[in-house]
């Protein structure tokens, strides 16, 4: 056993005791003692007091309170050894107690081991006896868990797929109301029907088929109940009431999932609304309106004597009713966004057999369906409107009123096209009525033309050669038509909406209301034998017509150019007439006819290329020979000059008076001015030819005079008894210019 004191301390005490000579009888010799002492001293001296063991020993001594005396030093070893022995004895006693306790523990452990062995034997026996019971209990527990799982599955299946009898009664019984519970149950049954498809994916499809068949029957019964309930509600539905029941809107959204029932319901609704609106239209036409309108509001039939107002009132009522009907149907069918469209689309997808083409993708257009429903609601109103409009138009013979009605119908056709679509029944009806009205308008125009053609008195031109009265009346009607068209469509050239090509929609009116009358008026000019009167008469007709349509671009676009072309041709004719009048009245025509061979057109030869090879080139006439022409003989030329002098003072007034019956003064003035200018050019030509002839004769006379001077002596004896020949030679010596002294400048001044 280890010591309670450090080993160094004990050894130090032993060494101290051994230093005494009498410490032991077995002490070694002195030499050995001396060596041992020396070694001891050396050891003591070499010991380091910084050693931890020495420090601990010193600390222990310090704690024991030992004083450094000789007695203490002598007894220290013994005391320490005694303490060591006592400590060891105490330890031995303690270990003895521990040994006894260990023996008792060993006995207990042996007893426990024996008991455990016995228990093991009992456990083995018990295990052998309980193993079948435990196995059976485990099997029963597994069966219990399986039964509980099946029970949970059955409860969940029953809760999800089986509808109770009470719920089925709410869903299918006609006595039960259509409320929130009905729609919730219907949604649940639809979900069950959809989930049955999962059951059909298993090996045993019997349960899925039975449940699907049962849910289908329940759904059909529910939809039939909903269909009948909606029909019942439609009978008492008031679309004018802004508070339309939300339940009927929801019912319509749900019923939309069955397109066949939904369309049948819409058919019933359309028939009911058609009856209601037809009755309301008849009431507005014939019965006095009471209530808010008061006595000032009268039936539409009161204005039947005025076709435009009568038809306008009917169209206004139809338009107002259409707008109200569309707004009411929008609140009924489209108030909740696209829910109805989604339901109908789902129904179309669920009924693929309803498609005409298997590959066709059916899509639902809500706005188009709404417009179609409004059209169907107004079927009776449209039929009554058509009958009344046609009767009014057929019984009226004023073309202006007919055209105003046609424009009114065109306006409402555009309005209904925007409201219900371009292919809606109302738009087609108004287009048909518009065409009917225009055909009646054209018929009235043809009848007027036929009547005028048979009235010979009306076809005789007036004395002042103005446009015939029937044409002026037709132009007055045309003016009213153009004003109506301008008020309806504007002054620009309008086109039909349905055509991409630019088509003037007023052109048919012009062809019916202007062209026949204009052609008839032009044909009456054949009654005038005088070409001048005939030209003036035709000019007045075209001028009057052009002035009427010139202010309207849509009329000028098609007819102004032909009228201007005809006027240009007539202007040329009048110019030729005026020119010929000036030439004949002044006598200048005789001189021009005589000078025809000397004109540039004659000297250049014929212009007809077909005769170029057949005619020989004529020799250039001698200008000096003009004096030998009959028209330029002194007497004739003096007479022509005198006639010209008599004509010039009043020439312009006479020429202007010649066209005084042309009803456009500026037109007549311009024609006269051009005719005067042409006359001046002709006179200038004659003047030039006369001067040229005199100059040519002067050259010939100089040559002849020289020859005469050489023969003067021999000629002096000739007979001079013929006085007439001498006078004639004297007059020829004066020259043509002196016989015809007028100049072009004087002519222009006198005719300006």
From Swiss-Prot:
Family: Belongs to the COG6 family.
Disulfide feature: none
Keywords: Golgi apparatus, Membrane, Protein transport, Transport
Residue spans of biased composition, Polar residues class: 601-619
Biased composition (Low complexity): 9-25
Record-level GO BP terms: intra-Golgi vesicle-mediated transport; protein transport
Region named Disordered: 1-36, 601-620, 702-736
CC terms in the record's Gene Ontology section: Golgi membrane; Golgi transport complex
Bilayer topology: Peripheral membrane protein
Pfam families given in the database record: COG6_C, COG6_N
Task performed by this protein: Acts as a component of the peripheral membrane COG complex that is involved in intra-Golgi protein trafficking. COG is located at the cis-Golgi, and regulates tethering of retrograde intra-Golgi vesicles and possibly a number of other membrane trafficking events.
Highest taxon of the lineage: Eukaryota
Main location: Golgi
Database matches in InterPro entries: COG6, COG6_C, COG6_N
Keyword Hydrolase set for record: no
Name this protein carries in UniProt: Conserved oligomeric Golgi complex subunit 6
Source organism of this protein record: Aspergillus terreus (strain NIH 2624 / FGSC A1156)
Comp. bias regions, Basic and acidic residues: 702-721
Subcellular location(s) of the protein: Golgi apparatus membrane
């Amino acid at each position: 056993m280890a010591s309670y004191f450090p080993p160094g301390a004990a050894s130090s005490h032993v060494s101290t005791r051994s230093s005494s000579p009498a410490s032991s009888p077995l002490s070694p010799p002195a030499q050995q003692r001396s060596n041992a002492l020396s070694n001891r001293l050396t050891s003591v001296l070499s010991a380091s007091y910084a050693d931890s063991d020495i420090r601990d020993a010193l600390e222990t001594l310090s704690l024991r309170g030992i004083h450094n005396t000789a007695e203490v030093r002598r007894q220290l070893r013994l005391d320490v050894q005694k303490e060591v022995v006592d400590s060891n004895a105490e330890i031995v006693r303690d270990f003895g107690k521990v040994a006894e306790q260990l023996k008792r523990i060993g006995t207990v452990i042996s007893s426990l081991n024996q008991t455990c062995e016995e228990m093991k034997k009992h456990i083995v026996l018990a295990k052998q006896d309980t193993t079948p019971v435990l196995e059976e209990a485990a099997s029963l527990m597994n069966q219990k868990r399986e039964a509980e799982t099946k029970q949970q599955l059955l409860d969940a299946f029953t809760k999800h797929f089986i509808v109770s009898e009470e719920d089925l009664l709410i869903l299918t019984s006609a006595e039960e109301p259509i409320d929130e519970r009905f729609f919730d149950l219907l949604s649940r049954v639809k979900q069950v029907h959809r989930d049955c498809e999962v059951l059909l994916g298993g090996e045993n499809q019997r349960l899925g088929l039975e449940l699907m068949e049962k849910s289908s029957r329940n759904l059909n019964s529910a939809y039939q109940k909903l269909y009948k309930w909606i029909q019942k509600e439609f009978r008492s539905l008031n679309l004018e009431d802004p508070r339309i029941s939300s339940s009927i809107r929801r019912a319509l959204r749900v019923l939309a999932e069955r397109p066949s029932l939904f369309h049948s319901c819409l058919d019933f609704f359309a028939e009911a609304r058609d009856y209601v609106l037809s009755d309301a239209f008849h009431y507005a036409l014939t019965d006095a309106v009471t209530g808010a309108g008061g006595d000032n509001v009268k039936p539409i039939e009161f204005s039947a004597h005025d076709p435009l107002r009568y038809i306008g009132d009917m169209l206004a009522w139809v338009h107002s009713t259409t707008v109200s009907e569309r707004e009411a149907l929008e609140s009924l069918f489209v108030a909740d966004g696209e829910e109805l469209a989604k339901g109908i689309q789902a129904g179309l997808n669920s009924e693929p057999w309803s498609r005409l083409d298997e590959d066709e993708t059916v899509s639902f257009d809500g706005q188009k369906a709404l417009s179609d429903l409004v059209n169907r609601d107004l079927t009776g109103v449209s039929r009554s409107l058509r009958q009344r409009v046609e009767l009014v138009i057929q019984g009226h013979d004023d073309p202006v009123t007919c055209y105003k009605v046609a424009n009114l119908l065109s306006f409402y056709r555009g309005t209904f096209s925007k409201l219900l679509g371009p292919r809606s029944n109302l738009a087609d009806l108004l287009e048909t009525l518009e065409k009917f009205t225009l055909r009646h308008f054209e018929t009235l125009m043809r009848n007027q033309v036929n009547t005028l053609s048979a009235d010979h008195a009306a076809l005789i031109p007036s004395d002042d050669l103005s446009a015939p009265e029937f044409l002026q009346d037709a132009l007055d009607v045309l003016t009213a038509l153009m004003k109506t068209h301008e008020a309806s469509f504007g002054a620009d050239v309008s086109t039909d909406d349905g055509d991409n090509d630019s088509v003037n929609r007023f052109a048919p009116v012009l062809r019916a209301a202007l062209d026949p009358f204009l052609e008839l008026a032009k044909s009456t000019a054949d009654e005038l034998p005088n070409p001048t009167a005939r030209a003036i008469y035709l000019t007045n007709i075209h001028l009057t017509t052009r002035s009427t349509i010139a202010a309207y671009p849509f009329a000028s676009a098609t007819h102004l150019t032909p009228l201007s072309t005809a006027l240009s041709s007539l202007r040329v004719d009048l110019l030729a007439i005026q020119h010929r009048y000036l030439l004949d009245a002044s006598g200048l025509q005789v001189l021009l006819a005589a000078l025809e061979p000397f004109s540039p057109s004659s000297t250049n030869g014929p212009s007809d290329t077909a005769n170029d090879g057949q005619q020989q080139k004529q020799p250039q006439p001698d200008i000096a020979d003009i004096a030998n022409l009959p028209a330029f003989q002194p007497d004739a030329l003096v007479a022509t000059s005198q006639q010209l002098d008599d004509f010039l003072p009043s020439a312009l007034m006479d020429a202007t008076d010649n066209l005084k019956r042309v009803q456009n003064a500026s037109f007549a003035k311009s024609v006269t001015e051009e005719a005067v200018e042409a006359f001046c050019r002709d006179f200038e030509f004659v003047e030039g030819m006369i001067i040229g002839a005199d100059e040519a004769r002067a050259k010939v006379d100089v040559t002849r005079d020289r020859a005469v001077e050489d023969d003067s002596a021999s000629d002096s004896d000739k007979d001079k008894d013929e006085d007439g020949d001498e006078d004639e030679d004297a007059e020829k010596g004066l020259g043509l210019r002196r016989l015809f002294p007028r100049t072009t400048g004087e002519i222009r001044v006198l005719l300006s």
